[in-house]
A protein has these predicted regions:
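Short, conserved sequence motifs used for protein processing/export or organelle targeting and
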Residues: 1-158
Length: 158
């Protein structure tokens, strides 16, 4: 993403919005920019499924359609994590984390008809909690960084 913006600078926390560096992510302008993007029609189509296959394994399926050349990315995330900080500026604090990426997949390439179907069995590490997990996926134009569609599927233990 940094290279697509003709930059060599990576910093934390760095937020990219639709393939562009967005330094004002802590301001109201970020919410407005996200809202504007969300009002636009998607230029790709993505579906996700997430289901248990046994007590410590999840079945993940992603289907997507977009123009040829577009890349699909899928991430398995976990919410409601905590860490006790032992050193540095936050020493002694208990930090809370959501949307922590546990597994990252991609780029998955569309075929010449602009389709991709991808399936995987994910064995959960002992410290992961399936009920706190979910999937996100996005289709991205690799030449411009533009996000053509993005979706999130939280775990539903229904």
């Amino acid at each position: 993403m940094v290279r697509l913006n003709h930059s060599a600078i990576v910093y934390t926390p760095q937020v990219m919005l639709n393939g562009k560096d967005f330094r004002a992510w802590g301001s109201d302008s970020f919410s407005r920019a996200v809202g504007e993007i969300n009002r636009q029609p998607a230029h790709a189509w993505i579906t996700l499924t997430l289901s248990p296959s046994d007590s410590n394994e999840l079945q993940v399926t992603a289907n997507a359609r977009a123009r040829s050349g577009v890349a699909l990315y899928v991430a398995l995330y976990e919410n409601n994590l905590q860490s006790k900080i032992k050193a540095g500026e936050n020493q002694g604090r208990q930090l809370h984390h959501d949307s922590v990426v546990r597994e990252w997949y991609g780029p998955l390439s569309m075929d010449r008809d602009g389709r991709v179907t991808w399936q995987l069995s994910v064995r959960l590490s002992p410290e992961w909690v399936a009920a706190k997990m979910g999937l996100v996926a996005f289709a991205q134009d690799p030449t411009t960084g533009e996000i053509l569609q993005a979706i999130r599927l939280p775990w539903c233990a229904g």
